[in-house]
Swiss-Prot record:
Keywords: Autophagy, Cytoplasmic vesicle, Endoplasmic reticulum, Golgi apparatus, Lipid transport, Membrane, Transmembrane, Transmembrane helix, Transport. Residues 32-42 have a biased composition (Basic and acidic residues). It catalyses: a 1,2-diacyl-sn-glycero-3-phosphocholine(in) = a 1,2-diacyl-sn-glycero-3-phosphocholine(out); a 1,2-diacyl-sn-glycero-3-phospho-L-serine(in) = a 1,2-diacyl-sn-glycero-3-phospho-L-serine(out); a 1,2-diacyl-sn-glycero-3-phosphoethanolamine(in) = a 1,2-diacyl-sn-glycero-3-phosphoethanolamine(out); a 1,2-diacyl-sn-glycero-3-phospho-(1D-myo-inositol-3-phosphate)(in) = a 1,2-diacyl-sn-glycero-3-phospho-(1D-myo-inositol-3-phosphate)(out). One of its GO terms (molecular function) is phospholipid scramblase activity. This is Autophagy-related protein 9. Forms a homotrimer with a solvated central pore, which is connected laterally to the cytosol through the cavity within each protomer. Acts as a lipid scramblase that uses its central pore to function: the central pore opens laterally to accommodate lipid headgroups, thereby enabling lipid flipping and redistribution of lipids added to the outer leaflet of ATG9-containing vesicles, thereby enabling growth into autophagosomes. It is a multi-pass membrane protein. It is found in: Preautophagosomal structure membrane; Cytoplasmic vesicle membrane; Golgi apparatus membrane; Endoplasmic reticulum membrane. The keyword Isomerase does not apply. Residues 391, 580-600 dip into the membrane without crossing it. Residues 101-112 have a biased composition (Polar residues). Residues 32-127, 715-736 are annotated as: Disordered. Residues 1-171, 244-390, 392-479, 534-579, 601-788 are cytoplasmic. It comes from Yarrowia lipolytica (strain CLIB 122 / E 150).
């Protein structure tokens, strides 16, 4: 078996996620001939007995090899080195045969039979010594080759991560183009900044009229030794990254073949197709080719939930740790400064990278699985000490590289955003969610592109919510400033139109012409006008914030009854900050990161180790994953802290809104459950009036646009106050455990586990499942709507 697998690896090559395919796929002719001879000798010895008995137990059905006899005398001689392709999916394979075709929707399957090169006779050697690998790869059917590689994937985490990266990158050409432009951007920033700093004599600019007069001859030869060392280090790293990208092209080509041949998604369709549809096609592919399942796992089907768990395995732990406040991201300030600024928390992209390096790379092994040591309480002290050392080492490295990082980021942000702010000064006041807020708002198993889309939908209503609050003092000052600046700009502009040659070069102050002041007053006018609220804006912050929560799914219980107050507005503003403030925090975090790593995060080491151990659950076919990501509602948290804002429930409902097709194995009584797929909009669009999340919010009294209460929609006045998908537990009310009639013995993980153990023709056991709960929930909401 090993020799056959190695032989196929030599022929077809592959990426790092394929078994024995880590090489470049090119070997010497002698090595190929030796392997062909050994492989054929092993199969020819027992060919008669195997053919008579039909016993192929020594070869799996996914890699069965047929012997090829020498041509009989008088028969037409075959061309040497032509290889019969992988046998097509045949209808004569029996009742269990299945193949997959997404266009027609048929499902049949047969074992994949790989035939030998027809140029190999019983003697064992090819008739001509040629590079068989290259010739066979060009002649084998691309679809069957892609299916063979899919059957030999060894690390599904890496494979699905690469598949998702390929999807978000929008195909082979777009990914390569993006990488080329990114590498060019980095090179441009370094080379251009070096030229501006070393090749221009700024003392000569005032009396010069051409670039040659201020250009320093042979400027690069005059660079200091430290500057030269930094440039050489950069170029070495740059070319190493370039080599990595070039080497990665082969895996991208394999992934393109997987999408195009097996999922039947070409480059054009990839630009518009939604990820849930891609995930469902992957699930259909794995189900139709169960005989070629990877790793001989007992898991017979890959579901969209499994794919999301594999892609988000590491990120789910970070989402949970931020949600449970395990990570201490407080900026360590002296006591006098703490009295003024309090204890602010800071998270930047640089700190995110440090967290990934220190925590995730420590918890997970290279295969993407949780290290067994983290699952045993006896190793807590050792692991905590090791994690603390990683934080300290990261703090030291941040101090060493801080000058270079701050210089690069400053130049990058300057080149990227200067033109934007120059063309549109009002954009300086635009807002975005800061990184810490993003991790608070992110949900379990929510892929990055889905999360970004949800936040993007909330930008406009969030800005309108903040703009509603009275800013009379700011508005009065802004109107006065805009009037003064507009007056100066109007006079200078009209004068320039009357006599352009005179006024454009006319100096109002020393070395400051009319053109300079027109730009200054124009920028002041644009910024001041952006601070004046619209006169047609209706003031209703409570309804506006509830509408924002339709997208963010965030409305803490302590905000209840205070949505109109300045306190809630200020707390929301700390999450939804101005872009300029976020950029300044990114630059400041380069200097503050060492202190946060050394003083704050080192205090969280014990909690991090305990959290990983207590919130990891083993799932057959997946390995250890975060308990919250499995939507196991019956499992109580080891820390016994109630999930006040119900993040796991919201994550489950939002997941169903995206992937909402019913499980394949459901009883006939569950077929009429209205799921999200029946109201799917184009490209992952969400119908807020028909989604599961919206019905859940209405059931709990949060009608964002109408402001209706539970009594308005027909709920019993005696019913206890319910928690909402966006607010958690109402103030003074106990959380409801029966939001959608959850049984304490039922959970999503029970449903998925039982489905994996059933055959396709077997109906599930007659017991209550999550779909039954949703069915009852929809009946209630429909009755309430009819009653209203």
């Amino acid at each position: 078996m090993t020799d056959k697998s190695t032989f196929l690896s030599v022929l077809f090559g592959g990426g790092s996620v394929y078994q024995d395919l880590d090489g470049d796929g090119e070997v010497e002719d002698a090595e190929i001939l030796r392997r062909v001879e050994e492989e054929h000798a092993q199969t020819s010895d027992n060919s008669n007995s195997d053919n008579d008995s039909g016993n192929d137990s020594d070869v799996p059905t996914s890699l069965m090899v047929e012997g090829v006899q020498d041509p009989k005398p008088g028969s037409k001689r075959r061309q040497p080195h032509r290889m019969a392709t992988l046998s097509n999916l045949q209808s004569s394979a029996g009742p269990g045969a299945r193949s997959v075709s997404f266009a027609q929707g048929t499902k049949t399957q047969t074992p994949i039979r790989l035939t030998k090169p027809t140029g190999v006779a019983n003697g064992g050697l090819p008739r001509h010594k040629q590079d068989l690998g290259a010739s066979i790869r060009t002649m084998v059917d691309p679809k069957e080759l892609a299916l063979w590689k899919w059957a030999n994937v060894q690390n599904l985490d890496n494979f699905f991560a690469e598949a998702y990266m390929y999807y978000t990158g929008k195909g082979l050409v777009s990914i390569i183009l993006s990488r080329v432009l990114n590498m060019s951007t980095i090179m441009f920033v370094v080379v251009f900044s070096t030229y501006l700093g070393s090749c221009i004599d700024y003392s000569k600019i005032k009396g010069s009229r051409t670039l040659d007069e201020v250009h320093v001859k042979q400027c690069y030869a005059k660079l200091g030794s430290f500057h030269v060392f930094v440039l050489w280090t950069f170029f070495v790293l740059w070319f190493m990254k370039l080599f990595q990208y070039v080497k990665d092209i082969r895996r991208l080509v394999d992934m393109k073949s997987f999408y195009q041949e097996l999922l039947e998604i070409d480059e054009n369709e990839l630009q518009t197709i939604s990820w849930p549809q891609v995930a469902k096609r992957m699930a259909t592919l794995s189900e139709a080719n169960a005989a070629t399942q990877v790793g001989n796992s007992t898991k017979q089907r890959i579901e969209p939930h499994d794919i999301a768990n594999r892609v988000m395995r590491k990120e789910n732990y970070l989402v949970a740790m931020f949600h449970k406040r395990v990570l201490n991201m407080t900026v360590p300030l002296p006591q006098p400064l703490q009295r003024i600024f309090g204890r602010p928390q800071l998270l930047s992209r640089a700190l995110e990278w440090n967290l990934s390096l220190c925590i995730l790379d420590y918890v997970f092994n290279p295969a993407g699985q949780v290290r067994p040591m983290f699952l045993k309480s006896t190793h807590k002290q050792i692991l905590s000490t090791g994690l603390r050392r990683r934080f300290v080492f990261a703090a030291i490295m941040n101090v060493v590289f801080a000058p270079f990082i701050i210089l690069y980021l400053a130049l990058l942000y300057f080149f990227r955003y200067f033109n934007e702010y120059h063309k549109n000064p009002a954009s300086i006041g635009t807002r975005r969610y800061n990184p810490l807020a993003e991790w608070k708002l992110r949900e379990y198993n929510e892929l990055p592109h889905q999360f970004e889309r949800r936040l993007t939908l909330s930008y406009i209503p969030a800005s309108k919510y903040l703009d509603q609050f009275p800013k009379e003092k700011t508005a009065l000052v802004s109107k006065f400033v805009s009037f003064i600046a507009g007056s100066f700009a109007a006079v200078l502009g009209i004068a320039s139109l009357i006599d352009p040659e005179l006024f454009l070069m006319f100096e109002i102050s020393a070395n400051r012409t009319v053109l300079f002041y027109i730009g200054v007053f124009g920028s002041i006018l644009a910024v001041s006008r952006s601070l004046i609220p619209e006169e047609t804006l209706v003031f209703d912050p409570e309804i506006s914030l509830r509408y924002v929560a339709e997208f963010t799914h965030y409305l803490p219980p302590e905000w209840e009854g205070k949505l109109h107050t300045e306190q809630v507005k200020n707390e929301f503003s700390l999450m939804y900050e101005m872009r300029l403030i976020i950029l300044l925090k990114e630059l400041a975090s380069i200097f503050l990161a060492p202190f946060i790593l050394y003083y704050s995060l080192t205090q969280s080491c014990d909690d991090i180790v305990d959290f990983i151990r207590d919130h990891s659950v083993h799932v057959d076919g997946l390995g250890y994953v975060c308990t919250f990501a499995m939507f196991d509602f019956k499992q109580k948290s080891p820390d016994h802290q109630p999930d006040e804002d119900q993040k796991m429930l919201k994550s489950y409902l939002y997941f169903m809104d995206h992937y909402g097709d019913k499980p394949t194995n459901v009883s006939q009584t569950q077929q009429n459950v209205p799921m999200y797929s029946s109201v799917r909009l184009k490209n992952d669009g969400l119908d807020l009036n028909n989604s599961i999340m919206q019905k859940f919010q209405k059931h709990n009294g949060h009608h964002a646009l109408s402001g209706l209460t539970q009594r308005d929609v027909g709920l019993s006045p005696a019913a206890p106050t319910a928690t909402t998908a966006t607010s958690g537990t109402a103030t003074g009310a106990a959380p409801r455990r029966d939001l959608i009639n959850f049984d304490v013995d039922e959970s999503f993980i029970d449903q998925t586990t039982s489905n994996r153990d059933m055959d396709n023709d077997e109906q599930p056991k007659d017991k209550e499942r999550v779909v039954d709960m949703l069915n009852q929930f929809y009946k209630k909401t429909d009755n309430m709507n009819l009653g209203a």
